[in-house]
């Protein structure tokens, strides 16, 4: 359902509708309607198709946005909030969410990069925390475990990362503030 409302889909549909209206108007000899709608419709349609071909949908959000709003606003760090905001939106022209971050951490494979499958918010001892599930791609699980200490520091001062092995090629990364 969320694929239906991506910006690429909306532009494609809008451009197609304008093009069809312009074509029908042209066929019925209504030049005042046909020219503008065709001239605007075709570029919008092509732009929508271009966006559609390069879009990366947001990962599944396992917890409703409203569920941890109060905890997020009171104890969430600005880095956690920025990370959440960054991954729950549509991306264009990238192979994976957090592409530049994973490249900087040397957790990237150009052919088959790690893919963020889902993100969840949770309460960790009264503190706001994020849990991300990655499909590892061709990056060995051992590389992730070697970088566990660096992961927390990379995403923000005072954050710690906890890694849990999931089933098959999945890895669960928890970013949280240490409990006092």
Model-flagged regions — what are they?
Residues 56-74, 92-128:
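An N-terminal amphipathic alpha-helical segment
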Residues 71-88:
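Cytosolic juxtamembrane regulatory segments of multi-pass membrane proteins
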Residues 122-180:
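Cytosol-/stroma-facing membrane-proximal "stalk/adaptor" domains immediately downstream
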Residues 89-96, 136-142:
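Short, surface-exposed ligand-recognition loops at beta-strand->loop->(often short) alpha-helix junctions
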Residues 83-92, 127-132:
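Short low-complexity stretches enriched in small and charged residues
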Residues 82, 108, 116, 136-137, ...:
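N-terminal low-complexity, charged segments
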Residues 1-69:
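N-terminal alpha-helical membrane-insertion module
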């Amino acid at each position: 359902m969320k694929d239906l409302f991506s910006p690429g889909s909306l532009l494609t549909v809008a451009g197609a509708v304008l093009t069809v209206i312009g074509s029908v108007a042209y066929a019925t000899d209504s030049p005042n309607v046909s020219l503008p709608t065709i001239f605007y419709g075709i570029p919008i349609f092509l732009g929508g198709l271009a966006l559609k071909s390069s879009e990366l949908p947001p990962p599944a959000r396992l917890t409703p946005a409203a569920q941890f709003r109060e905890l997020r606003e009171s104890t969430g760090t600005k880095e956690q909030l920025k990370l959440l905001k960054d991954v729950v939106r549509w991306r264009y022209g990238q192979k994976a969410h957090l592409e530049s971050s994973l490249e900087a951490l040397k957790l990237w494979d150009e052919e088959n990069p790690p893919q963020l499958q889902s993100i969840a918010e949770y309460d960790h001892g009264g503190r706001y925390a994020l849990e991300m599930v990655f499909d590892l791609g061709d990056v060995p699980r051992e590389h992730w475990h070697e970088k566990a200490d660096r992961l927390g520091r990379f995403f923000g001062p005072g954050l710690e990362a906890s890694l849990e092995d999931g089933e098959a090629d999945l890895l669960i990364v928890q970013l949280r503030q240490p409990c006092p």
